[in-house]
Amino acid sequence: MLTYPNINPIAFSFGPLKVHWYGLMYLIGFIGAWLLGYWRIKHYKLNWNNDQLSDLIFYSALGVILGGRVGYMLFYDFQEFIHHPWVLFKIWEGGMSFHGGLLGVVIAAWLFCRKYGKTFLEVGDFVAPLVPLGLAAGRLGNFINGELWGRATDVPWGMIYPHVDDQPRHPSQLYEFGLEGVALFILIWCYASKPRQQGRVSALFLMGYAICRLIAESFRQPDSQLGFVAFGWLTMGQVLSIPMLLIGIWLWWAKR
């Protein structure tokens, strides 16, 4: 069995200013997305320029942070939000929802489309290959924070989280790092390397992420304040991923 290494959540400090690994992972994700987008524009000679790319990353960053935090409080910790609304601003403590962030990015992309006259699916197809490595960075942030641990297990690589209990658990953050991050990146990046019908890359991302999340969540301990939210075995993350999967299937079929 393995033991969680109990990593200091603070990466470094400048006097009273403390930089947390969790926030640093988000910064790495946004910078990585810009670099990947820049490479795709140059390599594939896409009808994008650097100003558009920078604006898109900026809009998306706002959507991810605002939508992710609001989504977490609404989907996962609504009672805490009602009684202590100021916790909404404590992002460094963790607590971000991918699905809330996705809704935030959808709004940001709509505003971007209005500004630059691009279609929504064109923007979606451009963004999709840039996202998974950012998701990977976010899951590393979850692991460093020692949050979102897995269910009890007896597999040889089970990890004991001393701040939780003495039971070996699935390191589910690392599963999600591998599935939603690395595997999904390889899938989307390779698929998007050739010209595709508009909307196909977006559809593949929606389906791919939903499937990866549905699998990974089956090893993750449900949030203590929620437990299982449907049929006695579905978590909130799985419930929110099902519409993604259905929309992805519909879009894939519509763009066949």
From Swiss-Prot:
Which InterPro entries does the annotation name? Lgt
UniProt entry keywords in alphabetical sequence: Cell inner membrane, Cell membrane, Membrane, Transferase, Transmembrane, Transmembrane helix
Indicate the principal place this protein occupies in or around the cell.
membrane
Where's it found, cell-wise?
A: Cell inner membrane
Q: Give a Gene Ontology cellular component term annotated to this protein.
A: plasma membrane
Q: Where is a 1,2-diacyl-sn-glycero-3-phospho-(1'-sn-glycerol) annotated to bind? A: 139
**So, what pathway does this thing act in?**
Protein modification; lipoprotein biosynthesis (diacylglyceryl transfer)
Coiled-coil spans in chain? none
* E.C. no: 2.5.1.145
Sample GO molecular function, one term: phosphatidylglycerol-prolipoprotein diacylglyceryl transferase activity
On whether Signal is a keyword of this UniProt record, the answer is no
**What membrane topology is given?**
Multi-pass membrane protein
Q: Which GO terms describe its biological process?
A: lipoprotein biosynthetic process
Provide the transmembrane region boundaries. 19-39, 56-76, 91-111, 231-251
| A family per Pfam | LGT
Family label? Belongs to the Lgt family.
Q: What does this protein do?
A: Catalyzes the transfer of the diacylglyceryl group from phosphatidylglycerol to the sulfhydryl group of the N-terminal cysteine of a prolipoprotein, the first step in the formation of mature lipoproteins.
Q: Which HAMAP family match?
A: Lgt
Protein name as annotated: Phosphatidylglycerol--prolipoprotein diacylglyceryl transferase
Species of the source: Legionella pneumophila (strain Corby)
Q: What is the lineage of its organism?
A: Bacteria, Pseudomonadati, Pseudomonadota, Gammaproteobacteria, Legionellales
Q: Give me the gene this protein comes from.
A: lgt
